[in-house]
Each structure stands twice: as C-alpha cells, then as structure tokens.
C-alpha cells in the first residue's frame, strides 16, 4: 500500500484526470493504429512528467525567504504590490520567476508565517515573460506576515498557455517554509514582493529551485547555517 501512496504522492492531484484521459485515449488509438498509440503514450508520459511533485530539501529558518517555484529569475525591480491587497503606494522589491513547460509547476510557501489576505483577480493571458503580465494577467495574490514580522507577497500569474491557477490557502492559515500550496497549468510565472531594503541572495538570470533556493535572509548577520527538512 505504501508503494501506491508514494506513487500518487510524486504526481500532483491536478494531473490525475489529465493522465487518466491521455492514457485512455492512447489505449483507444493503439487499438486502431500502432503509431498513433505510440504518440499517445508519449503524450501521456509528458503529462506525468509535467505534473511531477518531487520532494525538496528545504532550509528551515524564520529569517529565510525561499523560492516558491522552479524557473528562471527573469526580473528584479522595484514595483508596487498588487493593489487588491491594500498595501498602498509603497514600492517593494519584486522578484519574478518564469516557469517554462519543462519546470516543476508545484508552488511552495516561501517563508514561515501567517496568511493575512488572499485575492483572486481574473484577467488576460499575455505571455507570462512580459512585464505587463504582473498587472493585467489572471493572478492569485497572497499577503503573509513572516514569523519575524516582515510582510511579504507572493503571486501566482497565469500565462499564455497556463489557464488554471490552483491555490489551497485560506486566510488565517499558519504556514511553514516549503509546504506545497498550489500549482499553475501550463507555463506561468510567480512574483515575490519583499520590503525595499531587503538584501537579496539571487540575481537576474539565475535558475531557482522551488523550496530550496534562498531568495533573501533577513537574519544574514546572525548566521549562515540552517537546518534542512525534506518536504
């Protein structure tokens, strides 16, 4: 039984219906044409690959902000946070992480703390790599207060191909760094907003690993050693 549980654990539940559908179509195609069946099997294998849900070794500290997603650090700039969260006109540092079709699309909590507010905003489906995607695209914005009191924002943004955002959080949730909280299908972007004077530990063009790459350390002067947990 544990083997079956482990098998389902490594695939995000959002992928079950797609994988089952692709597998069924592949079986039907194979009964008519072997080549079409092979194409269907390849498509099914890709679907399994897309919805993979691997464990990560998460650095544990109340001072850390880790990447909520796999992808490329596409942009780092000062920008206003999503207006729907009511944070006013104070700019923050925005770190934008672009996910392509081959990245893991499961999203993770970037820090220890409490969820203060959530807001889903329907919108357009511009290419997620464009700067205007942060403003106009469909998005799910989350405001949280870290265990040390800092307020940060993380935003799931739909893209040209991604047409579904899944967020399992609720206002008032106490959350831990690296916990899985959602997924975006298929190809997308995640923005993280941090206080202006935050010292970043990532740079533009860097590859980020969700749940592992440290974006910022608010206690950097105190220690550079962390414990790690597999999640």
From Swiss-Prot:
Pathway assigned in UniProt: Phospholipid metabolism; phosphatidylethanolamine biosynthesis; phosphatidylethanolamine from CDP-diacylglycerol: step 2/2
Post-translational modification note: Is synthesized initially as an inactive proenzyme. Formation of the active enzyme involves a self-maturation process in which the active site pyruvoyl group is generated from an internal serine residue via an autocatalytic post-translational modification. Two non-identical subunits are generated from the proenzyme in this reaction, and the pyruvate is formed at the N-terminus of the alpha chain, which is derived from the carboxyl end of the proenzyme.
Record's subcellular location: Cell membrane
Membrane topology: Peripheral membrane protein
UniProt keywords, alphabetically: Cell membrane, Decarboxylase, Lipid biosynthesis, Lipid metabolism, Lyase, Membrane, Phospholipid biosynthesis, Phospholipid metabolism, Pyruvate, Zymogen
Residues that bear Pyruvic acid (Ser): 188
Record protein name field: Phosphatidylserine decarboxylase proenzyme
Originating organism: Rickettsia rickettsii (strain Sheila Smith)
Gene name of this polypeptide: psd
């Amino acid at each position: 039984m544990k083997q079956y549980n482990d098998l389902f654990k490594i695939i995000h539940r959002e992928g079950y219906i797609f994988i089952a559908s692709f597998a069924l179509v592949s079986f039907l195609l194979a009964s008519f044409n072997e080549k079409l069946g092979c194409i269907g099997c390849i498509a099914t294998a890709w679907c399994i690959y897309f919805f993979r849900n691997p464990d990560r070794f998460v650095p544990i500290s109340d001072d850390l902000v880790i990447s909520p997603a796999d992808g490329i650090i596409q942009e780092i700039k000062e920008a206003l946070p999503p207006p729907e969260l009511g944070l006013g006109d104070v700019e923050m540092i925005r770190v934008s992480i672009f996910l392509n079709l081959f990245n893991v699309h499961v999203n993770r909590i970037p820090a220890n703390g409490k969820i203060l507010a959530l807001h889903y905003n329907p919108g357009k489906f511009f290419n997620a790599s464009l700067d205007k995607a942060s403003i106009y695209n469909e998005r799910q914005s989350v405001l949280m207060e870290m265990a040390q009191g800092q307020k940060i924002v993380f935003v799931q943004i739909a893209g040209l191909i991604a047409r579904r955002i899944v967020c399992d959080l609720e206002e008032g949730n106490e959350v831990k760094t690296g916990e899985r909280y959602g997924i975006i299908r298929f190809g997308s972007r995640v923005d993280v907003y941090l206080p202006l004077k935050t010292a970043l530990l990532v740079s533009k063009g860097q590859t980020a690993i969700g749940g592992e790459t440290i974006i910022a350390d608010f206690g950097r002067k105190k220690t550079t050693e962390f414990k790690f947990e597999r999640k």
